Amino acid sequence: MFNDMPVFDYEDIQLIPNKCIINSRSEADTSVQLGKYSFKLPVIPANMQTIIDETIAEQLAKDGYFYIMHRFDEESRKPFIKRMHEQNLIASISVGVKEYEYDFVTSLKEDAPEFVTIDIAHGHANSVIKMIQHIKKELPETFVIAGNVGTPEAVRELENAGADATKVGIGPGKVCITKVKTGFGTGGWQLAALRWCAKAARKPIIADGGIRTHGDIAKSIRFGATMVMIGSLFAGHLESPGKLVEIDGETFKEYYGSASEYQKGEHKNVEGKKILLPTKGHLSDTLTEMKQDLQSSISYAGGNDLAALRRVDYVIVKNSIWNGDSI
């Protein structure tokens, strides 16, 4: 079965244009529905400590974008939910699967967040299934995202356990070294893995990792994603929480993986690394550019909303679309 499955990644695929039916690309609707809520773009800044903090989360929510707050400042999660709700903003947090997280989830019954993401590296696990069931029992109205996974079997199991969406991607990210350290993952075939998983899914899929260009967002939607989680493209902004570093007069921002020793604070089961990214402008400018590029994608797809992207044909070009250029 596996040998018969087409294997490709983002750089191997080109989408084939259809006749344009809109007068201006600005007419294209990039909004997406997730649960009971609509958001301006089908993108999520990765729930990593060098990508998002409470200030950025608050601004994203105010501006109509989806976000997932990371789980690495555990004590601040309840006050964060309270502060968001006081402003009539959605609260979207992350949890792990350790024993104390069960009591934490139960403690949220009086002020339940709208979204909870179970965030572990290998999401096809009994511990994740157990946590999904616990959240659904304690917080029945909360939308549960579970991950990360890389197979249809995992998607079906997590959905059957009660997950409202699954996050697909094992180690394809720019600062993830799972594929090197363990030999496992979807690195190098993330887009094919997304396609494979989406065929089995009955609920939304979130593609997570391996996004290097804005065009990859359109490709993710073509192959079954409802939303796309992105790390490196959202890192390095002026507002980004990563530490600012100056080298020879140039400024950089730190960006490191959630399973790196920099995140863990110890060199144990390390599956992430740290890199320096040249500082970019403001996050709002990147979001605007993403929207404009996605509107262009929709116009090439021959429609007026994201659904048009799901119907386009494609060709597999095996790494040739860059013609020797680097990203």
From Swiss-Prot:
SUPFAM superfamilies: Inosine monophosphate dehydrogenase (IMPDH). Transmembrane segments: none annotated. GO terms for cellular component: cytosol; GMP reductase complex. It holds the Pfam family IMPDH. SMART domains: IMPDH (SM01240). Catalyzes the irreversible NADPH-dependent deamination of GMP to IMP. It functions in the conversion of nucleobase, nucleoside and nucleotide derivatives of G to A nucleotides, and in maintaining the intracellular balance of A and G nucleotides. The gene is guaC. The keyword Lipoprotein does not apply. GO terms for molecular function: GMP reductase activity. This is GMP reductase. Keywords: NADP, Oxidoreductase. It comes from the Bacteria. It comes from Streptococcus uberis (strain ATCC BAA-854 / 0140J). NADP(+) binds at residues 205-228. InterPro entries: Aldolase_TIM, GMP_reductase, GuaC_type_2, IMP_DH/GMP_Rdtase_CS, IMP_DH_GMPRt. HAMAP family: GMP_reduct_type2. Its EC number is 1.7.1.7.
